[in-house]
């Protein structure tokens, strides 16, 4: 079972605890999986435990002895002291298990950056870090679940389902209990109760952001880090807090790694990056991306245990490999900031339906100041205010997403043209639910990214997705979180003076269309999609072949085609 993932190392350790056997695998260069054993219990932990020192101190104050400094020992003592609720206290990127008697508890981190999968067999319950490991233990090595594979392609995969037959995903922020012949899965984190629970002014929110973000950044630093630096606001925000303290703490500067595009000027952000590293004194390494989305596709869909939508694993692997070559074990990125501080959909309707008239008036005045007439302001707010049956009917009539769906895809597979799932909710709940959507659903993209990184010997850290920072962001009142029409305005205000004004005042956003289109591999698309016998229901292959012959995909059509190629590669390689 452990041997099914040789990229995790060949140092194998197993321990029998009653009727349960726990095993870990490690690479000599990076031991990130630990095992703790007591006479009647055991624990395993895979990943990074950011707050181990704080937890150990709290346990010792309670009179509990922590056997050693490994994360597994901390988890062991925590479960012994606080039970399964101790998982709520853990911070970091992880999956793990605790065994006592006949019961085993498997757990996964709040946001789902660590991985955990499970399945049932006649002999009982099996769980592992990777789906392929569970698949092997079930006697169904790498057997695809064709229905689930199609669901992945069309974006409708159920949260617990995977692309491998018989293998279940443990959802983020969840734990699974197995004992006495039963298996139950339960969530341990319920962030919905936090939404708009704080009453803070904008100045207080900016101060609170700096406090929480500084803690989030500090937690991720190891002394062997590389920051993937862009010219936006997200990764520069990490640089602003990490770089000044990095050299005093670790004796060298925080290294930045940036992709440059000399042949695609519309994509290149070098001038912004240069301004950041000059102000913060960061060593910079640049590279010209060479990987394309379908490079070595069969290998990657095998490693990631399924096709991945949207994310280009070869391109991620390229920068992780370069980071490792720079000596990094931890790769910092500003990813997911948009889910924490940018989702403002249905803001006007939320303010109106909750009678926050002053904030609503300020929002309308801000739109008017951009030159929009009152009719445009009303149209902007109307869908958020309309009852579900009215809003849904209106958007279906508009069918605006026709340009996002290729003509060779049956619209019925995605719920029909114009379907807006957010508008199917009660109008009063739409903004609140939008703040939480990123914490729901199957997490196949971040799982695939984690497996890619693990295969290259690094962890990917996303300070903006730190649990305490995310909880703080959820707690902010809507009008404080989004005080004006400027994206991430709160972050820009908080970082004024810490980053160049060139970055904080930047209003444009880099579009990567030119780079995406340059990476189109029509020969690979034809090889994987057309030449094989497998067919996905709802895809018009004759029409798709005609489009491939023309070799003139737009960005969205190319992304759909790449996703379909990964589906075919995954099914055919089985």
Regions found by a protein language model. Give the residues of each.
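PAPS-dependent sulfotransferase catalytic core
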Residues: 345, 499-555
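Short, hydrophobic/amphipathic alpha-helical patches that form generic packing surfaces
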Residues: 76-80, 149-155, 437-447, 556-573
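Short Ser/Thr-interspersed hydrophobic loop/turn segments at strand-loop and sheet-helix junctions
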Residues: 21-31, 110, 438-451, 473, ...
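Short amphipathic alpha-helical segments and their helix-coil junctions
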Residues: 55-62, 418-428, 473-474, 534-552, ...
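Structural motif
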Residues: 62-70, 139-146, 204, 309-310, ...
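Short coil/turn segments at secondary-structure boundaries
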Residues: 13-17, 88-92, 161-171, 220-228, ...
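ATP-dependent adenylate-handling active sites, centered on carboxylate activation for C-N bond formation
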Residues: 61, 102-105, 110-116, 120-122, ...
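Cysteine-centered catalytic environments shared across enzyme families
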Residues: 1-299, 316, 540, 568
């Amino acid at each position: 079972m452990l041997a099914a993932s040789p990229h995790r190392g060949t140092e194998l350790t197993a321990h029998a605890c009653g009727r349960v056997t726990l095993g870990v695998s490690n690479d000599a260069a990076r031991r990130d999986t630990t095992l703790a054993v007591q006479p009647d219990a055991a624990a395993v932990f895979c990943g990074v435990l950011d707050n181990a020192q704080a937890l150990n101190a709290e346990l010792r104050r309670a009179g509990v002895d922590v056997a050693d400094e490994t994360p597994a020992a901390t988890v062991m003592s925590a479960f012994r002291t606080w039970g399964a609720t101790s998982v709520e206290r853990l911070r970091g990127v992880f999956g793990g298990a605790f065994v006592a008697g006949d019961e085993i508890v498997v757990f996964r981190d709040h946001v789902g950056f660590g991985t955990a999968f499970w399945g049932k067999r006649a002999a009982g319950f099996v769980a592992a870090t990777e789906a392929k490991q569970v698949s092997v233990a079930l006697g169904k090595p790498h057997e695809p679940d064709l229905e689930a594979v199609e669901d992945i392609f069309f974006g409708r995969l159920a949260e617990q389902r995977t692309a491998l037959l018989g293998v279940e995903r443990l959802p983020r922020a969840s734990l699974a209990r197995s004992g006495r012949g039963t298996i139950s899965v339960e969530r341990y984190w319920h962030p919905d109760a936090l939404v708009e629970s704080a009453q803070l002014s904008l100045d207080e929110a900016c101060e609170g952001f700096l406090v929480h973000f500084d803690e989030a950044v500090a937690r991720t630093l190891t002394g062997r880090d590389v920051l993937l630096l862009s010219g936006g606001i997200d990764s520069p925000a990490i640089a602003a807090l990490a770089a000044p303290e990095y050299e005093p703490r670790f004796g060298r500067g925080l290294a930045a790694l940036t992709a440059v595009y000399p042949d695609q000027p519309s994509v290149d952000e070098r001038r912004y990056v240069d301004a950041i590293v000059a102000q913060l004194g960061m060593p910079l390494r640049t590279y010209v991306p060479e990987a394309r989305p379908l490079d070595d596709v069969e290998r990657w869909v095998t490693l990631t245990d399924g096709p991945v939508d949207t994310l280009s694993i070869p391109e991620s692997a390229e920068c992780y490999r370069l980071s490792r070559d720079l000596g990094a074990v931890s790769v910092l990125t500003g990813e997911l900031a948009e889910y924490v501080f940018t989702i403002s959909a249905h803001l006007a309707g939320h303010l109106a339906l909750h009678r926050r008239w002053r904030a609503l008036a300020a929002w309308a005045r801000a739109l008017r100041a951009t030159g929009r007439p009152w009719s445009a302001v009303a149209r902007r707010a109307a869908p958020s205010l309309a009852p579900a049956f009215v809003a849904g009917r209106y958007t279906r009539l508009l069918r605006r997403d026709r340009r996002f769906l290729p003509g060779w895809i049956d619209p019925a597979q995605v719920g029909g043209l114009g379907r807006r799932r957010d508008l199917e909710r009660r109008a009063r709940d739409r903004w609140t639910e939008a703040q939480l959507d990123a914490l729901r659903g199957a997490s196949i993209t971040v799982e695939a990214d984690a497996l890619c990184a693990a295969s290259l010997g690094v962890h990917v850290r996303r300070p903006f997705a730190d649990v305490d920072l995310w909880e703080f962001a959820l707690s902010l009142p809507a009008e404080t979180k989004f005080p004006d029409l400027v994206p991430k305005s709160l972050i820009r205000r908080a970082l004024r003076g810490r980053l160049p004004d060139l970055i904080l005042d930047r209003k444009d956003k880099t579009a990567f269309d030119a780079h995406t289109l340059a990476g189109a591999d029509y020969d690979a698309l034809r090889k994987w999609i057309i030449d094989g016998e497998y067919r996905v229901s709802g895809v018009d292959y004759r029409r798709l072949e005609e489009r491939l012959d023309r070799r003139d995909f737009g960005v969205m059509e190319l992304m759909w085609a790449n996703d379909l190629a990964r589906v075919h590669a995954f099914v055919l390689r089985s």
